[in-house]
Amino acid sequence: MYKAFLIKYGEIGVKGKNRFIFEDALVRQIKFSLKDVEGEFDVRRADGRIYVNALSDYDYDEVIESLTRVFGIVGICPVVQIEDNGFDDLANQVINYLDKAYKNKNLTFKVNARRTRKNYPMNSMEINMELGGRILDAFPEMKVDVHKPEVLLQVEIRGDVINIYSIEVPGPGGMPIGTAGKAMLLLSGGIDSPVAGYMVAKRGVQIEATYFHAPPYTSERAKQKVIDLAKIVSKYSGPITLNVVNFTDIQMAIYEKCPHDELTIIMRIYMMKIAEDLGKSSGCQGLVTGESIGQVASQTMASLYCTNEVCTMPVFRPVIGFDKQEIIDISEKIGSYETSIQPFEDCCTIFVAKHPVTKPNLNIIKQHETNLDGVIEELYKTAIETTEKIVIE
């Protein structure tokens, strides 16, 4: 029935002279989202709108599912597009549309007509009234309700084409990917960091990710778990380059030479340093973490102060004020929760002190870091140089 989808967007519409940049980015992301959907589609801007036109048979539910993951979209409207062959033809097409779209006709409705072509022989109010009358004649069981109709019939007269639709599937909102710069996500196998990546991507940020692997203490299944999480996030963010850093030697050096109650915070400091260096080399302008205040020892205010101090890039923590259940709710919504709870430990959970410091003093931490002098420099360089890059699409 539907050969086209009208894409509605929110914030993009107020971007003034730069609007086309955001619209083009949204078109690219829509095309990416449909690449694995069976069928052929044409995505284009036309008359101030974005349309997805189906050029072959397709699975309706699959298209809707893909489009509801595209940031920047606030509504997806399956439309029937007709040529302007006069009002009688329009009325017949509307009646045919309602007959097919709604098996139960015992519904209230409202007609909302709009014209961009002002030379149409009827104004919007006249179209509303005439179409409403034709609908009542065709379906006597339907009733008019202009305040809270069950069916809001939209009729848009644009140039020589008329759009007819009454269904609007909510989109995720946000901004198109790539319109707000690029950031490096510190991605672990936990619940929080995939959610953090999702949330900054929603604001138009392109995501790259870094995962710290510690073989033989962490398994290949733990690594695959993170790859799977990156794939889930990429359904929303678009392609992700995943940097897999071999962190074992650095962790062992910290374990052997630094106070055990400071293991977590010092390891976290080196993770931030490495992620920032990798990010600088690929054009990132910030770091993203899944830290939430007070959730674990490395996420107290004092601990976050210490890890922030080593970074020159801004550090974004989208879930900083969320409690655990709020983060879990989002992870379930985006489909990452079941993967995150798979029982494969990463390096953050293996080298953990029994009684980690919760109020680290930055000056003392820096002093204890000097225990690594003469050792850490070469290990750090090797970790950067041997980083494995995996492109997730």
Please give the residue ranges for each predicted region.
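A conserved beta-strand->alpha-helix junction
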Residues: A230-K257, D346
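The feature marks non-catalytic terminal segments
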Residues: E338, Q342-E393
